[in-house]
């Protein structure tokens, strides 16, 4: 009799209506894992009322006590933590996904109220896990360098990409999105949370220079409200560009994919990333990409983006202007980007993740070989 392993999946990052990059990873990998029913049985372990945590204390209470209790009740053979904290008061094997170590490298980039959780609790969680899935080679290297975790305890599994981003949007959807936000024919765009490391301010500064000679172009910034976002709105107003720098707020995937597919170029000038999912989405949708020349974006983007020196306004502005005036460069970037994006899939990520599960559980393979015989 073959017994399929029972995997308890921490679903806290799937709560709420606004999905961050971490939530999008959790959603993508969970959907792909659920399709592997011949290999594993995946059960989503939800917090009470399926609501996001409003305080760090709630999160720790969930990770320390409530999650292990739910996993035990579900008879989980293994717990997968797709984001952050690892429960320690349990004998059930634990696999955690590590996205980045930005808080350890740059603690000033985190809100003071959550620094303890990310600078102490999370490193301890990584050390206590049975195995770590790193979303990039860069994150793996950081885990080894900053936390002295043995390389053999870490497996790199890149994100996948939702196949909907490869679809050509309907003409009526393009018109609808443009009309809704007052978007012109030519525009640059950014997607993501409004944080200093994303270098939104740098993009606004670069655009303010470009805008003087190119009145027909806009900058579209997609992302949820935050205090930093409000400061960026003020900055756009100070430049007198409130009509040409568009803050859309949070958008659903369909509208984001539509904008990717028609933008002049997608900007990703981040100073720090763990993976950079918007980069992958933009390439899949056919957007020419301008990205900062940091290691992780080169790992994910390959030869597809136009790379610029991180933190340099003139370099970013110059690349934006070249994209604006040279259709050949844009087309080359589009072709390379879509080809690169095709190398990433959630199905492949799920297979590699299951391989980690099997290794942690002391099992071997799944091509017709019993996972466990009882």
Give the ranges of each region predicted by the language model.
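Carbohydrate transferase catalytic cores enriched for Leloir-type hexosyltransferases
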Residues: 1-374
């Amino acid at each position: 009799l073959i017994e399929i392993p029972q995997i308890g999946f921490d679903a806290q990052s799937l709560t709420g209506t606004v999905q961050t990059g971490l939530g999008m990873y959790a959603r993508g990998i969970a959907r792909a894992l659920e399709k592997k029913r011949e290999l594993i049985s995946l059960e989503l372990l939800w917090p009470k009322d399926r609501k996001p945590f409003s305080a760090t204390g709630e999160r720790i209470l969930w990770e320390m006590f409530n999650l292990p209790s739910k996993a035990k009740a579900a008879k989980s053979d293994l717990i997968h933590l797709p984001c952050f904290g690892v429960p320690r008061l349990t004998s059930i094997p634990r696999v955690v996904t590590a996205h980045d170590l930005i808080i350890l490298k740059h603690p000033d980039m985190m809100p003071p109220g959550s620094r303890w959780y990310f600078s102490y609790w999370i490193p301890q969680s990584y050390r206590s896990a049975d195995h770590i899935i790193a979303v990039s080679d860069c994150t793996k290297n950081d885990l080894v360098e900053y936390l002295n975790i043995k390389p053999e305890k870490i497996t790199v599994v890149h994100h996948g990409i939702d196949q909907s981003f490869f679809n050509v949007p309907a003409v009526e959807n393009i018109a609808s999105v443009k009309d809704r936000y007052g978007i012109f024919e030519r525009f640059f765009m950014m997607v993501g949370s409004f944080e200093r490391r994303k270098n939104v301010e740098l993009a606004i500064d670069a655009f303010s220079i470009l805008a003087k000679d190119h009145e027909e172009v806009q900058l579209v910034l997609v992302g949820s409200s935050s205090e930093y976002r409000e400061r960026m709105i003020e900055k756009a107003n100070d430049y007198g560009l409130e009509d040409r720098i568009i803050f859309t707020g949070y958008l659903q995937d369909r509208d984001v994919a539509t904008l990717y597919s028609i933008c002049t170029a997608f900007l990703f000038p981040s100073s720090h990333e763990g993976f950079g999912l918007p980069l992958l989405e933009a390439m899949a949708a056919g957007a020419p990409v301008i990205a900062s020349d940091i290691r992780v974006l080169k790992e994910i983007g390959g030869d597809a983006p136009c790379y610029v020196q991180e933190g340099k306004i003139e370099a970013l502005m110059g690349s934006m202007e070249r994209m604006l005036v040279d259709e050949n460069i844009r087309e080359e970037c589009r072709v390379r980007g879509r080809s690169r994006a095709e190398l990433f899939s959630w199905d492949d990520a799920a297979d590699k993740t299951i391989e980690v599960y099997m290794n942690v559980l002391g099992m071997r393979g799944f091509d017709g070989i019993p996972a466990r015989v009882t």
